[in-house]
């Protein structure tokens, strides 16, 4: 009986790992198919974010299939065929929801990197608010991966990334207003993730 229980436990573990591989592979292929040729620089950024998410997942024992899949898909709303409102977190989340993507992944995409604040500035906060904010370590980790990866997919500090975003969009742009107003919350999420990675913060 013990041998059978052990065999069943091993089989269950293998099946769970296989499910993770399949889910992440599907997310990666979806992102590649719509971004690699149409938006190659955005694709490099997404690749960098997803690679960092894989490393963070291993370090923090987070739900790998959810975090890494969301990392691959977080900018899919920039794809021309997906654009609806022009606000990529919302457009990406709606698109994924329509395809039947896992709810947690959809919500993480909708809310990634404090998107609700920019949505409120744009006057569409109510549209993003229908997607629940997961909060916690996994949510923070996605923000961390996004904000510490350059547009070309290279590692960068969060403060430098914020400076780069302001320079790219220029003064007076709504994104510049958002990143300025949202910087404290964004940096706090990144700091929490860094503390978790260092073993200083556990939750």
Regions found by a protein language model. Give the residues of each.
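Extreme N-terminal basic, low-complexity initiation segments
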Residues: 2-10
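Divalent metal-dependent phosphate-bond-processing catalytic cores, especially two-metal-ion Mg2+/Mn2+ enzymes
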Residues: 12-17, 21-22, 34-62, 73, ...
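Short coil-to-beta-strand
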Residues: 23-26, 66
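Short glycine/proline-rich turn/loop motifs
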Residues: 28-33
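His-Asp-centered metal-binding catalytic motifs of divalent-metal-dependent phosphohydrolases/nucleases
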Residues: 63-92, 96, 106-116
């Amino acid at each position: 009986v013990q041998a059978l229980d052990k065999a069943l436990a091993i089989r269950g573990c293998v099946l769970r790992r296989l499910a993770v591989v399949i889910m992440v592979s599907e997310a990666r292929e979806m992102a590649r198919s719509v971004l690699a040729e149409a938006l190659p620089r955005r694709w490099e950024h997404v690749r960098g974010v997803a690679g960092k998410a894989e490393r963070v997942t291993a370090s923090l024992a987070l739900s790998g299939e959810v975090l890494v899949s969301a990392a691959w898909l977080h900018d899919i709303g920039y794809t021309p065929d997906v654009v609806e409102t022009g606000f990529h977190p919302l457009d990406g989340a709606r698109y994924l929801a329509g395809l039947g993507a896992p709810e947690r992944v959809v919500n993480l995409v909708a809310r990634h990197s404090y998107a609700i604040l920019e949505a409120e500035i744009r006057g569409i906060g109510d549209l993003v608010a229908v997607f629940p904010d997961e909060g916690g370590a996994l949510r923070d980790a996605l923000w961390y991966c996004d904000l510490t990866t350059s547009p070309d997919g290279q590692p960068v500090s969060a403060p430098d990334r914020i400076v780069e975003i302001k320079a790219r969009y220029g003064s007076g742009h709504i994104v510049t207003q958002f990143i300025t107003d949202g910087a404290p919350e964004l940096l706090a999420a990144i700091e929490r993730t860094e503390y978790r990675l260092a073993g200083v913060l556990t939750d």
